Each structure stands twice: as structure tokens, then as C-alpha cells.
């Protein structure tokens, strides 16, 4: 654990990784807290508001039982177990069962369609999947195309042909199971990337990935954990940000996690949930924060101690709104599926600079480099790289040695994100390499323009892309969701264009403005710029 301090440089100097040779996430996140005291592990809130508390003692018993179910089905160490569920008790339970048995779990977004599901299950060779009725409706149409998939466990509802009932199978199994003695470097989970280019790639992570996340989680959540902490995120528990920024670090530290299955994010319902369950630590993706600001949320019962966000730069306007609404700073972090939480913020360690991702996490050596792994001078644009080895980094891309090789250069993992580091050590995200807009000889990153647009009083959300231009190579186009009380018009579009011209530069203003009711998003709340580019 990090020692609480206000001296960032000393915190980094004194940090030492302590990765034990033998390590299993089930033991670390469950068994060591299952002491008979009944301390809560998961607080699940159903759609109707009813809640169920599950203790670490119960979670240990349940996960041992389901590990026996997996073993009885003939699965062995290294086999893959897929989880196609939204936030629920069954999700961490099944992960822990797979970890116990030395198997590899595969989280799958509940919103995945048939094609996305088929690719990931076929590519991973999953032998068992745990899902619910809505997941089974999608799965049964492709089941015949998945010869390696032997077992489908159904949560809730009546088991139908081709499925097995999850809870009856678990309850009938023995609670005695000897957790496999795994090495810290043994495979534990495959998390598929969002597939911005080509098919998604499966990042194979080891048990040590949890330990690699802890320094940033502890820093960003203001030296987490502290007495009374309770953690929640609206993000799907299939994303590395929800799993390893929230769920497993909380369980590792013995902190209760609130889970809630919602059809869509409701800002006012989110505030009520946090008040009802005394949530103190949240991970709120930028989209959630923007929607909360748009809804002008307030609730006297919300008493947050820490707010973490990441995935898109927030900008000064949103930072100010969070500060005035919740009375604390929002701490942004940066990472990716392959190598997460390498950079972050903590206002007690150094001042927050709007638009910056923060500084390198203790234990991480982050640099701006070229594509050969050579370090670039401070202030220069380049690829954000993380020096290796680092316990948070994936083992490899599953069954994809060529992509694995391309992910590294010299001593560094290449994030594929462009950024710069200023003289004070702050990192600034510029864009994905494939998001850069080339216009009239300039290379322009969309994030700075989007940040500027959010400062205009009419703009609730925005996304900026490049569209083909025979003269300029690309022209800048802004897709804008308006705040309540504003109506789309040519006059407003011109006003917004002039606003960016004045605030940024003449070559950075959007020559085209498209008003829209919503923006296409990934399941993790990131804007799908490629879909907007395809629309022209």
C-alpha cells in the first residue's frame, strides 16, 4: 500500500514492487477476508431498488462450490470460462471460481451482439459460459458455430434445452476446494480490446495484473482504502476499467462494492444510489459526468471522498463543475487494456492541470517516445510508452504473436496514443494515432477542440473528426449534443465556430457543425469517432 504523503517525488523514489512468486486473485480478493465476521463484499441493488449483501465468507463458499462445478464438467487448469453478464453477484463469483481452479476468465460486455460474441468465444476457445436469459437469447443463435463451447450456465429464469441452471448446480456442489497454487505470472484473464483496427485482440493477463493496478487506484482514490470506504461505478464490469480500477482492488482491500443493473445511465438515479448505500469512492466515466452536469444533479445525501475518471479528457469546465457539485477534485487516470493505470492525478500530491492526465504512477516509468522506442525531449509530441517489465502489463495478445511483437519497441510498450510530457512531468493526451486530423498541413488532435467546445454554454457533449477534403486533406467536423434550452440553428453553428477560432486557432475551428441528439459510444463510454467519420 502507498503511504499517505504530500510529497509525490518521495512517494515515487521510495516505491518498490512486491510481487510474490505465488499469487492467486481468488485468495487475495476473497479468502483472506473470509474470517467469519460476515464483513460485506458485494452489495447488489436490483432494478426495483431491493438490495442483497453478500459477505466475503459467503463469496468464498460460493466460489469454491462453483469451482467444483467447473472441475466436474471436465475443465482443467488453463481452460477458458466466459462471463456474459452485466453487474451482478454472479459475475465476481464466477471470476473467483475460475481463478481458484487455475482457469482463465473472459469478461464479455452484456451489450455485445451475436457477431461480437461469436468472435470472442471462438477466438478464446471458451469451454464454459455463464450468462442470463437475455444473453442466452443471443448465444443460442450462434451456439452451433462454437464447437468448443460445452457448457452454458444460466443465471435466473428456467434452464432450457442447451443450458444448465447456475444456482442449483452451485448449491449441489461441495464447498471444499483446494485453490490451485498459481504463480503470479500464470494466466488469469483475457480481456478483448475494442478493435479500433481489425478484429479485437485478446489481452492475456496474469494474476499479477491486480497488484499492478493497486498503486494507481490507491493514489487516485486519495490513498485508498480508508475506514468507511464503499466503491461503485456505473461502468460495465466487463471493461478493464471497471474490473481492475474498481471491483477487484476494492475486494482485495476488503472494501464493499456496490453493483447495480440499470438499462441505461440515469444521473438522478445514480445520485440516489450513492446516497442510499453510502458510496464514498466512485469511478465515473467522462460521459457519466457530462450527463450528470447536463441534468444539474444535486443530492444532500451524497458524501463522496474520491472521484476517479478516465477514457477521455475532462477539461476545465467539467473539473470546475465536479468541484462545485461534490466539493472534491476529480482525479483523472490513464491506461489501456494492455497496460492500465500508468498515469494519474492526486490533488494532494500535485496541482491538477485541466486537460492533463497527471503524472506517472509510482512504480511506472512513462515516457514520450518514437515508434522505435527512443525517448523524445520534453514538450515534443510522440507515442506514450511504458517501460517494461511492469506487473500490470499483459502477457501477450491471445494467439496473436505478430500483434504482440508490434506492441513493444525497445524497452517500452507502445500505447498507440499520442501525447506529450511537459517540463513539470505532467502528461497530456493528444489523440490516438489513428484519430489525428491532417488539415491544411497541420496535424490536429480532436481532444483539445472537444475540450474547447465544452466551454461553450450551449454544448453538452461533442466529438470531433476529420472528413475528406480535396484541398485541405481533411476538414474538421464537430458533432454536437446541445444542452437543454438551446435549439440547433445555423446562427448557433456559426457562433460555436467563432468561439473555437477565438479560443484555439483559425486552423482548429470546425468548418462543419452537425447537431445531433446523441453520439455513438462504446460500452465503456468512449465516443466512436470512426462511426462519425463513416457518416461523413
For each predicted feature, which ranges?
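Conserved pre-ATP/AMP-binding loop-to-beta segment of ANL
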Residues: 38-40, 171-192, 199, 224-230
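Conserved AMP-binding/adenylation subdomain of ANL enzymes
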Residues: 211-233, 238-280, 295
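Conserved AMP-binding/adenylate-forming core of the ANL superfamily
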Residues: 42-96, 113-118, 167-168
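Gly/Ser/Thr-rich phosphate-binding loop
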Residues: 252, 279-284, 293-352, 365
Amino acid at each position: 500500500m502507498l503511504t499517505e504523503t504530500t510529497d509525490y517525488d518521495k512517494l515515487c523514489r521510495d516505491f518498490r514492487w512486491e510481487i510474490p512468486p505465488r499469487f492467486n486473485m481468488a485468495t487475495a480478493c476473497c479468502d483472506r477476508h473470509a474470517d467469519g465476521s460476515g464483513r460485506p463484499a458485494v452489495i447488489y441493488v436490483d432494478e426495483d431498488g431491493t438490495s442483497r449483501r453478500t459477505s466475503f465468507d459467503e463469496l468464498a463458499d460460493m466460489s469454491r462450490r462453483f469451482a467444483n462445478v467447473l472441475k466436474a464438467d471436465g475443465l482443467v487448469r488453463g481452460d477458458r470460462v466466459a462471463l456474459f453478464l452485466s453487474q451482478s453477484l454472479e459475475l465476481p463469483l464466477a471470476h473467483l471460481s475460475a481463478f481458484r481452479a487455475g482457469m482463465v476468465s473472459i469478461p464479455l460486455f452484456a451489450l455485445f451482439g451475436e457477431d461480437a460474441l461469436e468472435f470472442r468465444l471462438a477466438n478464446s476457445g471458451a469451454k464454459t459460459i455463464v450468462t442470463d436469459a437475455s444473453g442466452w437469447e443471443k448465444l443460442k443463435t450462434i451456439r452451433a458455430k462454437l464447437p468448443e463451447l460445452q457448457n452454458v450456465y444460466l443465471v435466473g429464469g428456467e434452464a432450457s434445452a442447451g443450458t444448465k441452471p447456475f444456482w442449483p448446480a452451485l448449491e449441489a456442489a461441495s464447498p471444499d476446494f483446494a485453490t490451485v497454487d498459481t504463480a503470479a505470472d500464470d494466466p488469469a484473464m483475457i480481456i478483448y480490446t475494442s478493435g479500433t483496427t481489425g478484429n479485437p485482440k485478446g489481452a492475456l493477463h496474469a494474476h499479477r495484473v491486480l497488484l499492478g493496478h493497486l498503486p494507481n487506484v490507491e493514489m487516485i482514490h486519495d490513498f485508498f482504502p480508508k475506514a468507511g470506504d464503499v466503491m461503485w461505478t456505473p461502468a460495465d464490469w466487463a471493461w478493464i476499467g471497471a474490473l481492475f480500477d474498481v471491483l477487484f482492488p476494492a475486494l482485495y482491500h476488503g472494501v464493499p462494492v456496490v453493483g447495480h443493473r440499470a438499462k441505461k445511465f440515469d444521473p438522478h438515479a445514480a445520485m440516489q444510489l450513492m446516497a442510499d448505500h453510502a458510496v464514498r469512492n466512485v469511478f465515473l466515466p467522462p460521459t457519466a459526468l457530462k450527463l450528470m452536469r447536463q441534468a444539474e444533479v444535486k443530492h444532500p445525501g451524497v458524501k463522496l471522498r474520491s472521484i476517479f475518471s478516465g477514457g477521455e479528457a475532462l477539461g476545465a469546465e467539467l473539473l470546475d463543475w465536479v468541484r462545485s457539485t461534490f466539493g472534491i477534485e476529480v482525479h483523472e487516470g490513464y491506461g489501456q487494456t494492455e497496460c492500465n493505470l500508468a498515469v494519474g492525478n492526486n490533488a494532494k500530491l500535485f496541482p491538477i492541470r485541466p486537460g492533463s492526465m497527471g503524472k506517472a504512477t509510482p512504480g511506472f516509468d512513462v515516457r514520450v517516445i518514437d515508434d522505435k522506442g527512443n525517448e523524445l525531449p520534453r514538450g515534443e509530441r510522440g507515442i506514450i510508452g511504458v517501460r517494461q517489465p511492469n506487473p500490470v502489463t499483459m502477457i501477450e495478445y491471445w494467439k496473436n504473436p505478430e500483434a504482440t511483437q508490434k506492441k513493444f519497441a525497445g524497452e517500452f510498450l507502445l500505447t498507440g496514443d499520442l501525447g506529450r510530457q511537459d517540463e513539470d512531468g505532467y502528461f497530456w493526451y493528444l489523440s490516438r494515432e489513428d484519430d489525428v486530423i491532417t488539415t491544411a498541413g497541420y496535424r490536429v488532435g480532436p481532444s483539445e477542440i472537444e475540450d474547447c467546445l465544452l466551454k461553450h454554454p450551449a454544448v453538452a457533449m461533442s466529438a470531433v473528426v476529420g472528413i475528406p477534403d480535396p484541398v485541405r486533406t481533411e476538414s474538421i467536423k464537430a458533432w454536437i449534443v446541445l444542452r437543454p434550452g438551446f435549439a440547433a440553428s445555423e446562427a448557433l453553428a456559426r457562433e460555436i465556430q467563432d468561439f473555437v477560432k477565438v479560443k484555439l486557432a483559425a486552423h482548429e475551428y470546425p468548418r462543419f457543425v452537425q447537431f445531433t441528439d446523441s453520439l455513438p459510444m462504446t460500452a465503456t463510454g468512449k465516443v466512436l469517432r470512426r462511426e462519425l467519420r463513416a457518416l461523413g
